[in-house]
Amino acid sequence: MHQNDTVGLPHKIKWITLCGLLMAINTIFSSFSVPVPGGHIYLNDIIIVIAALSLDPLGAFLVGGVGAFLGDFFFYPLPMFVSLATHGIRSVVMSLIVGRYGRDNSPVVLGATVLGALIAIAGYTLGKAYVYSTWEYAMLKLPFEILQAFIGSATVSYTHLTL
């Protein structure tokens, strides 16, 4: 191992540790839900938004996409690929926006969380229509998808903007 290979090693170790911790929390939060007609509202959106606003795009994808995928894999496997794609895209887009325009810029953070919520709503609505082979079921769940996306985005945006 050359000396240049160890430059930035503490940063890499912190990054891997933080991503692993947030991915585990995301997976655990996937097991907690609030029952609603036709399904559940999951609390892991809060961790996904935190990761997207705090990490680089790769870390955001690992925490948001892969963490949600693992949560579904362990607790409710049918939509796990929908979660991987939807939360993965959502996390990367949000991370790219705040990474480019500033994590401390309130309008940017708010805009990124709103766009992320719209991606989650559209992704899950289309994904559920495909997975369950019925557009009606996806429409039945739409108000709850909106509520879940709003809870995650609003909670994190509020705390992020007031700190």
Task: Give the location of each predicted region.
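Loop-helix junctions at membrane interfaces
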Residues: 1-161
